[in-house]
């Protein structure tokens, strides 16, 4: 361990403490000057809680995204490059406007680009065309199809995948291409 940096794990200690009012701040406890940062954030992790007005609250995707921005602000101007790994893309289901609706995913990606993020890595984006909101920034959409199939075959006993006993159903239009792939293998 040197300068708060753990060379065994490459993890840097950071936190987003909350004040009694619910406001938060981002705090990086190690030097990051000249480093490539990979910030991992799970916006769907509802098990994290914080106290506000003596009441415990579960963190929402909006809370997680605010904490991500706080950590990016704490790192800005010091890190060589900032990469965000977001397995579930924040606002990913709000990628297309119908009537008077917000485009949360596109706005969030543009906000991260403005803050100096170099690259976003996500898994199975609801609609990968959301990358069009940030054409000059890196956007890697990793498709975990093989891993899903491998896990399914190794954990479900007596899984029968014959045409008569197995059906792949798409929950919505965004998952149609992925499920067509699953049905074809």
Predicted segments with their positions:
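PRPP-associated nucleotide enzymes
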Residues: 1-185
